[in-house]
């Protein structure tokens, strides 16, 4: 029997080759979604609107934004590092929403899910730039969601860390004994959340069964974010 959890939904996933993109595309399609995988860079101010226009009708937008995380101490962060990180992670988000939200409001139906980071919820050394950018995403979600909810459009975010993905936790990082020791010591789950586990949760949030969530930020980090 075919899986119809997301049947009939057109879901646009940005940066589909990065971060959670590959697994999201696979899992959401398995659940019956018509997946539109965008691989364009979104740093050009005109790119987000162009991507949304090219996609046609979008029932669900998954803002899957990623950039290699800088590991600079706060005292040494350059203006270039700060600006380029925000240009990749923060600036495209309101541009995407501006492009996709009007049609959702008109239809009185839609979902926007931001694939964020738990570094916005709990600090880590040498992640001040990255954590600040991810926190800006969450701040935007919290306010924009309140405005969209009155039109039956839900905006939420997954704040993840220690989840399998090719951008931040590639296989070569996972194989390092030092990293494995860190996981056992610092992450209550004792392992990485699998990419599929994360994507299955995203699929639920995109479904009609999750229509009650407004401006929610869901930590998916093996217990690390709540310690």
Which positions does each model-derived feature cover?
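Catalytic loop of short-chain dehydrogenase/reductase
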Residues: 111-136, 141-150, 162-163
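Short C-terminal tail/terminal secondary-structure segment
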Residues: 122, 203, 214-227
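Substrate-binding pocket helix/loop in short-chain dehydrogenase/reductase
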Residues: 72-74, 78-86, 179, 183
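Short, small/polar-rich loop/turn modules that mediate ligand/substrate recognition or access, typified
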Residues: 149, 154, 213-215
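Canonical Rossmann dinucleotide-binding motif of NAD(H)/NADP(H)-dependent dehydrogenases/reductases
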Residues: 2-36
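A glycine/serine/threonine-rich, flexible loop-to-helix segment
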Residues: 150, 162-186
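Alpha-helical segment proximal to the catalytic Tyr-Lys
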Residues: 102, 146-147, 211
């Amino acid at each position: 029997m075919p899986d119809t959890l997301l049947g009939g939904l057109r879901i646009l996933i940005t940066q589909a080759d990065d971060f959670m993109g590959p697994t999201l595309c696979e899992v959401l399609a398995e659940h019956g979604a018509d997946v539109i995988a965008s691989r364009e860079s979104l740093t050009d101010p005109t790119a987000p609107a162009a991507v949304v226009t090219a996609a046609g009708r979008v029932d669900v937008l998954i803002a899957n934004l990623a950039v290699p995380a800088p590991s600079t101490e706060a005292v040494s962060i350059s203006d270039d590092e700060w600006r380029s990180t925000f240009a990749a992670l923060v600036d495209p988000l309101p541009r995407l929403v501006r492009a996709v939200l009007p049609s959702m409001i008109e239809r009185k139906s839609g979902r926007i899910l931001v694939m964020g980071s738990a570094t916005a919820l709990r600090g880590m050394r040498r992640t001040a730039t990255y954590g600040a950018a991810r926190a800006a995403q969450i701040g935007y979600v919290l306010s924009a969601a309140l405005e969209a909810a009155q039109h039956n459009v839900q905006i939420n975010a997954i704040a993840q860390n220690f989840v399998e993905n090719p951008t931040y936790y590639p296989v070569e990082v996972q194989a390092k004994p030092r990293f494995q020791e860190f996981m056992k010591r610092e992450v209550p789950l004792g392992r990485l959340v699998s990419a599929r586990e994360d994507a299955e949760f995203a699929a639920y949030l995109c479904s009609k069964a999750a229509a009650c969530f407004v401006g929610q930020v869901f930590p998916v980090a093996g217990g690390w974010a709540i310690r």
